[in-house]
Amino acid sequence: MIAFADLEGQSALIGQLQHDFARGSYVHAYLLTGPGGTGKRSAAQLCTMAALCRGEHKPCGACGPCRRVLSGTHPDVHTVVPEKGKQIIGVGVMREMLDTVAVKSFEDGAKVILIPQAERMNAAAQNCLLKTLEEPPERTVFFLITDQPAALLPTIVSRCRVVRFHPLTEEACQKRLIALGQSPEMAKKKARIAEGCVGRALEIDDDQLDLRMELTHSVFSVHHPADALGVVNMYKEDKERQKLVLDTLEIALRDILVQQAGGASVADAGYAREALDYASRVPLSGGLTLMETLRRARVMLASNVAFASAFETVLLQISEEYAKWPW
C-alpha cells in the first residue's frame, strides 16, 4: 500500500491533508490539481482511507474499511465517470450520484465522492454539483481531480479547498525511479520525458521511448516543404499515437530551447541526430517560433481541424527555419 510519505515533492500539502483526515477535520470538498502523474489520485485514495479508517493510525491499511477502499468495494465510496461509450460526464450521471449522497451511509461513517476527471463534467453536470456544494451533506467529502482546473466553473473552484500538486525536479524523479527498480539509464530518460512526474514516468513504455527517436528523426529531417507530406502520412492514420506525437515533440522542443538558451545539451536525451543538428543550427528565436507554431497546432486540433493539417503547419515551420539558417 502506498503511504502519504511516498508522495515525494508534495511534503507541505500532503502533511496538511494527512493532518486534516487523521483528525477528522477535513472540509467538504477538495480540488486536487496539477500535471498527470504527480500523485493526485493516490492522495485522494489515502485521504479516503483515512476518513473511513477504524485503526489507531489513519490510514492503517489493515482494517476492513481500508481494505475495501483499496479493493474498490467500499459501499460508501462513489466514483463519478462518464457513461459507457461517452467522454463527457453528463447531468444524468451527476444526479444519480447525488441521489446516493442523500442516502444514509452503509457503514455509519463518512461518504466519499471521487470525480477523477472533473474537467469532463459538462456545464449542466457542474451546475448540478454546484447546488450540492453550496449546501453540502453532513459527513460527505468530495474529491475533484483534474489537470485542467480552468475547465471548471469558478463558483465550483471557490467552494473547494484547492490543493496544487507539482512535479519533482528531473533529478529527484530519476532517483525515485531508481529506488523503484528502474535502471539509471532508463530512469534518466523517463524522468526527462515525464517532466518530473513519477506516475507518468512509470507509465512510459518502450513504444514511447522508440517514438522519441523515430519522431525526432523524421520531423527534423523536413528540410524542404516537399518533405512534410511523407512525415504527415506516417502518423495521420494512427489516432492513438497522435496526441503522443505532439506531446513528445513538445518535450523535444523544450529541451532544444534549453540548449539554444545556453543550458544543458540535448546530446544525451535520446533524440535522433537530426534533432541535435536542429538545436545547433537554429537560434533561440527559431525555436521559440516553432514552439508557438506547435501551440497553434494544438488549438487547431481542439477546433476539430484534421491532425494532418495541424501537424503539417509544424513541419512547414521547421523547413522554413532550416531555409533561414543554412549550414
Regions found by a protein language model. Give the residues of each.
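Catalytic acidic motif of RecA-like/P-loop NTPases
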Residues: P116-N122, N127-E134, A150
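Clamp-loader machinery-focused feature within the broader ASCE/P-loop NTPase space
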Residues: M1-A124, A279
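Conserved catalytic/switch belt of AAA+ P-loop NTPases
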Residues: A102, N127-L144
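Charged, glycine-rich active-site and insertion segments that engage polyanionic ligands
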Residues: M1-M49, P65-R68, E138-T140, D147-W327
